[in-house]
Curated annotation (Swiss-Prot):
Organism: Shewanella violacea (strain JCM 10179 / CIP 106290 / LMG 19151 / DSS12)
Named cofactor requirement(s): Zn(2+)
Keywords: Hydrolase, Lipid A biosynthesis, Lipid biosynthesis, Lipid metabolism, Metal-binding, Zinc
Active-site residues, as the UniProt record annotates them: 265 (proton donor)
Catalytic activity annotation: a UDP-3-O-[(3R)-3-hydroxyacyl]-N-acetyl-alpha-D-glucosamine + H2O = a UDP-3-O-[(3R)-3-hydroxyacyl]-alpha-D-glucosamine + acetate
Molecular-function GO term, any one: metal ion binding
Gene Ontology terms: biological process: lipid A biosynthetic process
UniProt function note: Catalyzes the hydrolysis of UDP-3-O-myristoyl-N-acetylglucosamine to form UDP-3-O-myristoylglucosamine and acetate, the committed step in lipid A biosynthesis.
Pathway where it operates: Glycolipid biosynthesis; lipid IV(A) biosynthesis; lipid IV(A) from (3R)-3-hydroxytetradecanoyl-[acyl-carrier-protein] and UDP-N-acetyl-alpha-D-glucosamine: step 2/6
EC number: 3.5.1.108
Keyword Lipid metabolism carried by entry: yes
Record-given protein name: UDP-3-O-acyl-N-acetylglucosamine deacetylase
Leading EC class: hydrolase
């Protein structure tokens, strides 16, 4: 049986909020089987829990934000969720003492490191996968995103930026998902932005925590970061990273093919909502063995049952 996963014990880190520029403390704790990912605002009295559900993604400008019915939000969840998805973690409690997840270095890599350092624990319940049975597609002008039936989890992703640096890079990528491929090829790709936009955002009290420490910054002609890029195709890889995180609010690892052209947070969430609303387009399945399972997550070292 392929089992559900959580973290072995609590792990904590401190970072900066991208939009506020303030210090943010993040804790990741083990959670019971079938509880999914639940985020908790510990800076509020009493603390407020927000489950990671597609219908609670109510803000997608520059990030993905969960907002409950009282308007309480937790923003910038996508990089953390990409790490959770990439390592196959089904259940976790995410505590944060601010309205946003810390941006860390702008990628999923610090979260992957945290999760691997504390250890991953298999739980005594079968892992559920969301298998795509019918094509689901949403469009917005020339942008589109689609999920199709497929035996594993495959990504076919294209971006289209006219900036000279991005235009010279590879703007298309195909990959077969596995935890090892995610960690090696995707997790270190950083968010990117343009100097002209950053100046405007700061003038409007946004992106106050943004810097070259947590983003690839471009002027009109070049990358401004002294160390350059981590991957030659870091731009398309970061968009794939974002999509991994955005898709994980479906609540399960996806078995299917994800195809995208110029998509972003809003379109990704529309796709998840459209998928879940069409109940004959998907099914939940479990698998007996790693060989049988179509999506490969690395086996946690020293796994124990809870």
């Amino acid at each position: 049986m392929i089992f559900q996963r959580t973290v072995k014990e609590m792990v904590k880190t401190i970072g900066v909020g991208l939009h506020s520029g303030n210090k943010v403390t993040l804790s990741i704790k083990p959670a019971p089987v079938n509880s999914g990912i639940v985020l908790v605002r510990t800076d509020l009295e009493p603390a407020v829990s927000i489950p990671a559900k597609a219908e609670l993604v109510r803000e997608t400008t520059m990030c993905t934000a969960l907002v409950n019915d009282d308007g309480i939000r937790i923003s910038t969840i996508e990089h953390l969720f990409a790490a959770l998805a990439g390592l196959g973690i089904d259940n976790a409690i995410i505590e944060v003492d601010a309205p946003e997840i810390p941006i860390m270095d702008g990628s999923a890599s610090p979260f992957v490191f945290l999760l691997q350092s504390v250890g991953i624990q298999e739980q005594a319940a079968p892992k559920k996968y969301l298998r795509i049975k019918k094509n689901i597609r949403v469009e917005d002008g020339d942008k589109w995103v689609e999920l199709k039936p497929y035996k594993g989890f495959k990504i076919d992703f294209t971006i289209d930026f006219e900036h000279p640096v991005i235009a010279r890079s590879e703007q298309h990528m195909k990959m077969e998902f596995s935890s090892s491929a995610f960690i090696r090829d995707i997790s270190r790709a950083r968010t990117f932005g343009f100097m002209r936009d950053i100046e405007y955002l700061r003038a409007n009290n946004l992106a106050l925590g943004g810097s070259m420490e947590n983003a690839v910054v471009l002027d009109e002609y070049k990358v401004l970061n002294p160390d350059g890029l981590r991957y030659e195709d870091e731009f398309v890889k970061h968009k794939i990273l974002d999509a991994f995180g955005d898709l994980y609010v479906a609540g399960y690892a996806i078995v299917g093919e994800f195809c995208a052209y110029k998509t972003g947070h809003a379109l990704n969430n529309r796709l998840v909502r459209a998928l879940l609303a069409q109940q004959d387009a998907w099914e939940l399945v479990s698998f007996e063995t790693e060989r049988e399972a179509p999506v490969s997550f690395s086996v946690p070292s020293g796994a124990v049952f809870a």
